[in-house]
Every structure is written in structure tokens, then in C-alpha cells.
């Protein structure tokens, strides 16, 4: 650890202000991207680079202050994962507008619990373990390298990459979405032998940037999913629904949205669960091994770099958040006009399920983040398990009550509402230990980082609520438009939220077309087997979750993602050849890859922020 023996300023007013601004910016970007394609990007490295550039203007800035800014801002990328669930409340027809304070409390209390639950795990999982924590180590390395360069050239160069990407994407977004001078997508379709073949091309620089971050394996998997959906499933199924009065675009879109998407839902579900199952054994074994080997002396306990938030502080915050959750659940349940008995019962059980499942997923997600990285951790799998457990619990409690169609809709909404809290807890715990690893490597004070994360939760929650509302009012969600006459093609897909809503409705209403979902599960299992075989060759992989997403998302979204992933491969291959004989080859390649990552992040931020601004106008 670099600064273990020094006592440098860490939690500063300027750092908190900068961290709060970055939290709001990256939260808005991630909410937009997550609703559009079901992906979010890690904000840690862009936050580190921006922080270094801005704080270099102050002579007294230091590496630990920079670390606190990225710790706070990183909450944006993770807390915004609640958008994988919350839109489901609109898709199931229960909400027609956002209750702002309920949404805020879900994010705040769920995220806060995620921070608190992982504090006791810091020493065992961060200090004593040999887990990789890839994003945490990467952020620490950037901080260390930049700190050696007192002129902060690295930070200034990095912020130029982000700014350039943001500017280009914002201009294009202004032309296409603002002035409508450029098309945002093009649709092509034709009918052959009573089978409809469709294709659409999206022109989104944010998606291009996201594809660059996804990489080649993810791009190929998305392409495979897209080919299955539009080259096989849609043409085959459209043959049975051929209508000469429909044009090719309408027929293909109708079959894909009503049937093929359910196949994608099944594939996503089994792939997410498989990822979770695959990690279960190493998670359990790893935690056992870590706990067995933990040893700490009294001297170490008193060192600055070993001090967490006190048990008293944790307990007080825990009680406040549980009480806040209970009040939020009661407010939600009260709208259903149930008897006081059921109001109290569902409020208590909803809070209990959120806290108990949240505790277990916090440990699991923290370990998985260390094992495979926050970006690869199967958060959607956690959400899937959460909505299934919540639905079953409430179905058992109100089996007779929920025979009423209106109350059945309420039950679906309650299960989704509960899952949103669980996912907020999982998302933050997924990121918390990653940040603490960065702090451990540079010599930060743990309790100060934990405070920064809690502050990040507050500002992240404040940003998520209005941004969600703006985007919903401007674009709507698939199957849930705020007003009549809106362009359904511009609706935000929110694929994971649609999946959660579909599963919950299937459990309570018994009206889901399980046949298509079952076939999707079969497709997912087939992709898992193929992925295993390919990994055995050690040359490539085919992420099954990405295949499912490729089936579920429209080509207008998939194609830019695929192009972005292929583009990264081409660029890195060119650079590998260019620096083949360079004595600093690895360092050069790492620097170029980081610049590409920052530029791609800038594309996402530029278009996303502009999309939010246009929505507000």
C-alpha cells in the first residue's frame, strides 16, 4: 500500500462536490443506456481520470482524495442497476407515473444496505483474499501512475478523450434526435415464401461505444442471438401468421415482439441462473477459506487503513434504513385499499424479504465481483431469483386474496417492488468491495470510503428519480407508453425489467405463453454447452447471456453494439502488430486500450446526457 504511513486529506469538501457532480452525470448516462439496451458501464475509471484532471488544479490534491471521488462516483454505475427492475411496475400496468419519493427510498435504502452489509466482509474478502478485483486493481494502477506524474498529464490526456467522445456523440444526437436532420435508425424487411425477414440499423454512437466496451466475444454472441431471432425464428413463426394485408415490416415486428422476444426471455433467464450456479461453488469455498485464515493483531486494528465504520454507526444506519423501507412498503401497499391486517403483513414481509435476501446476495455479489469483476457479475440473475422468491412468498400469503384480478396486479407489482430493493442492495455490494480494493492498494482509510459510498448512494438516488421520470415521459417503455399517439418505435426496451414483469405476471396470472419461454430455455442451454466447448479451446467464448439479449433486443440496438465490439478487436490487432517489436509493448497496448475505453465512455456519456436533456425539453 502506497500511503499507509501518511495521513493525507481524503474526505474533502471539494472532493465531495466533484464526486456528487460526477455521480449525477454518470447516473444519468447509465440510466439512459440501461433502459435502452439493458447494459451499464463502469464509471470508476472515467471518474478517476476526470478527478485527476480537475483536482490537479489544486496544489494540495493527492491520490487519496482522488480515490474518494471515484469511490463516490462509482455508485452511479451500480445503483442505476435498479432500472433493471423498476420499469416493470409500468410494464405490468400498475404504475402510470413515478411516485418520486418511493423510488428515491428504494434506491437510498437498498443501496445503503448494500454498503452496510459488505463492511464486515472487507477484511476477509479484500485484505486477506487473493481475489482479482479487476476494476479495483485497474483504478488503483491509474491512480498510482498518475500520482508519479506531478503535472497530471495522464489525467489531462484522459479527460480529452472523454470530452472528445462526448462532444462527437452530443453533436450527432442533436442532429438526429434534436433537429431530426439525421435518421436514428433504418428499417428493411421483405416477405419470401410467406416468411417475413426483417432488419433494422441503428445509428447510435452511445451503442457503438458500449459495444467497444463489450468486446469481441460479446459482439459475436449478440450477433448470434440477432441471427437466430431474425434469420430463423421470426421467418419460421411468421409463416404461421402470414397476413397478406400486412406489410413485411409490420408482420416481422409483430411476430418478433409477441413470440420471439419470449424465446429471448427464456434464454436470458437460464443464462443468468447458470452464471449464478457456476459461481456458487467457488463463492462458498472461497468464503470458507478466507474466514478460516483471517488473523489480525491488536496493532493492526488501530492502524488507519484497518478502521471501518463503527458497529454503533452501522447499527444506527441499519435501523434507520429498515424503518425507512418499512414506511416505503407501507406507502406502496396502502394504495391497494387492503385491510389494515394485510397492509401491515405485506409491509412487514416485503421489508423482511428485502433485508434477508439482500444480506445473502451482498456477500455473494461481493465475492463474484472479486472473482470475475463488477461488469461480469450476474446482477440480472440476482434480480431473477429475487422476483421468483418474492412472487412465491406473496402468492403463499395471499393465495385467496389474489384471485381478484385487480389485487393480482397489485401482487405482481409488490413482487417487483420488493425485487427492486434487493437489486439495489446487490448492485452496490457488487461495487463496494471493488472500491475498497482500490483503497486498500493505495492506502485509503476504509471508513472514509464507506462514508463516500453512502454519500454516492444519496446523490445517485436523487439523480435516478428525475432522470427515470424524464425518460419515461419522453420515450415511454416497451408496452407501457405514458400517452396515446406516442411513437412506439422510440420506446425504451428495458429488457431486464420486461423479463421480471413477465416472470411475475406468469406466476400470479398463469397467462404466460410458457412454450416459447421453455424453448428459449432450451436455446439458452444449447448456448451454454457451446460456450463450454469453445472455452475448452481457450481461443474464444460465446457468452450465453449475450446471445439471449441478442434475441431479445431489436437489430437497431444490436448492430451498433456488434460493430463496436468488432471495431475494438480490429484496433487492438492493428496496435499489437504496430508495437510487436517495441520493448515497452505491454505498456503501450495498455495505454492505448485505456484511451479507447475513455473515448468509448465519452460517446456513451455525450449521447446519454443529451438524450436526457432532450427528454427534459
Per-region residue spans from a language model:
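Alpha-helical multipass membrane-protein architecture
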Residues: 1-617
Amino acid at each position: 500500500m502506497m500511503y499507509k504511513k501518511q495521513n493525507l486529506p481524503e474526505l474533502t469538501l471539494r472532493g465531495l462536490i466533484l464526486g456528487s457532480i460526477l455521480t449525477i452525470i454518470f447516473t444519468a448516462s447509465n440510466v439512459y443506456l440501461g433502459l435502452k439496451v439493458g447494459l451499464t458501464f463502469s464509471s470508476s475509471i472515467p471518474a478517476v481520470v476526470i478527478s485527476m484532471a480537475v483536482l490537479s488544479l489544486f496544489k494540495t490534491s493527492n491520490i487519496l482524495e482522488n480515490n474518494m471521488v471515484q469511490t463516490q462516483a462509482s455508485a452511479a454505475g451500480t445503483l442505476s442497476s435498479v432500472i433493471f427492475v423498476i420499469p416493470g411496475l409500468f410494464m405490468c400496468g400498475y404504475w402510470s407515473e413515478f411516485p418520486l419519493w418511493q423510488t428515491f427510498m428504494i434506491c437510498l435504502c437498498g443501496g445503503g444496505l448494500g454498503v452496510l452489509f459488505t463492511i464486515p466482509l472487507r477484511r476477509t474478502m479484500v485484505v486477506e483474499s487473493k481475489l482479482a478485483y479487476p476494476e479495483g486493481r485497474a483504478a488503483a494502477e491509474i491512480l498510482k501512475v498518475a500520482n508519479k506524474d506531478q503535472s497530471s498529464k495522464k489525467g489531462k490526456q484522459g479527460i480529452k478523450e472523454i470530452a472528445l467522445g462526448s462532444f462527437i456523440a452530443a453533436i450527432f444526437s442533436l442532429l438526429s434526435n434534436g433537429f431530426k436532420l439525421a435518421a436514428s435508425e433504418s428499417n428493411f424487411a421483405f416477405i419470401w415464401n410467406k416468411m417475413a425477414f426483417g432488419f433494422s440499423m441503428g445509428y447510435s454512437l452511445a451503442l457503438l461505444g458500449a459495444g467497444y466496451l463489450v468486446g469481441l466475444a460479446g459482439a459475436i454472441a449478440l450477433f448470434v442471438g440477432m441471427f437466430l431471432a431474425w434469420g430463423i425464428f421470426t421467418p419460421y413463426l411468421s409463416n404461421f401468421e402470414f397476413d397478406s394485408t400486412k406489410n413485411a415490416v409490420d408482420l416481422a415486428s409483430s411476430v418478433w415482439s409477441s413470440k420471439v422476444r419470449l424465446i429471448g426471455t427464456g434464454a436470458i433467464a437460464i443464462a443468468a441462473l447458470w452464471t449464478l450456479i457456476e459461481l456458487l461453488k467457488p463463492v462458498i469455498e472461497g468464503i470458507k477459506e478466507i474466514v478460516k485464515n483471517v488473523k489480525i493483531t491488536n496493532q493492526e486494528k488501530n492502524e488507519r487503513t484497518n478502521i471501518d465504520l463503527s458497529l454503533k454507526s452501522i447499527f444506527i444506519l441499519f435501523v434507520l434504513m429498515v424503518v425507512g423501507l418499512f414506511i416505503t412498503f407501507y406507502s406502496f401497499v396502502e394504495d391497494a385499499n387492503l385491510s389494515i391486517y394485510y397492509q401491515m403483513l405485506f409491509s412487514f414481509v416485503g421489508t423482511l424479504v428485502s433485508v434477508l435476501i439482500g444480506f445473502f446476495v451482498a456477500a455473494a455479489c461481493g465475492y463474484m465481483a472479486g472473482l470475475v469483476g463488477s461488469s461480469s457479475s450476474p446482477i440480472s440473475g440476482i434480480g431473477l431469483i429475487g422476483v421468483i422468491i418474492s412472487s412465491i412468498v406473496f402468492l403463499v400469503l395471499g393465495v385467496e386474496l389474489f384471485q381478484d384480478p385487480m389485487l393480482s396486479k397489485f401482487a405482481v407489482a409488490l413482487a417487483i417492488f420488493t425485487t427492486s430493493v434487493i437489486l439495489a442492495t446487490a448492485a452496490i455490494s457488487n461495487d463496494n468491495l471493488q472500491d475498497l480494493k482500490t483503497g486498500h492498494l493505495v492506502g485509503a482509510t476504509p471508513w472514509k470510503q464507506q462514508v463516500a459510498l453512502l454519500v454516492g448512494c444519496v446523490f445517485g438516488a436523487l439523480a435516478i428519480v428525475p432522470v427515470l421520470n424524464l425518460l419515461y415521459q419522453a420515450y415511454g417503455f416497451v408496452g407501457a407508453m405514458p400517452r396515446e399517439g406516442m411513437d412506439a418505435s422510440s420506446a425504451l426496451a428495458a429488457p431486464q425489467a420486461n423479463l421480471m414483469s413477465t416472470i411475475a405476471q406468469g406466476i400470479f396470472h398463469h397467462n404466460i405463453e410458457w412454450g416459447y419461454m421453455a424453448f428459449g430455455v432450451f436455446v439458452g442451454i444449447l448456448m451454454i454447452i457451446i460456450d463450454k466447448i469453445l472455452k475448452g479451446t481457450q481461443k474464444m467464448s460465446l457468452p450465453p447471456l449475450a446471445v439471449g439479449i441478442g434475441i431479445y433486443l431489436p437489430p437497431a440496438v444490436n448492430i451498433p453494439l456488434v460493430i463496436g465490439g468488432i471495431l475494438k478487436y480490429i484496433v487492438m490487432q492493428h496496435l499489437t502488430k504496430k508495437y510487436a517489436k517495441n520493448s515497452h509493448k505491454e505498456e503501450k497496448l495498455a495505454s492505448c486500450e485505456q484511451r479507447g475505453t475513455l473515448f468509448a465512455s465519452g460517446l456513451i456519456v455525450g449521447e446519454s446526457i443529451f438524450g436526457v436533456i432532450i427528454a427534459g425539453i
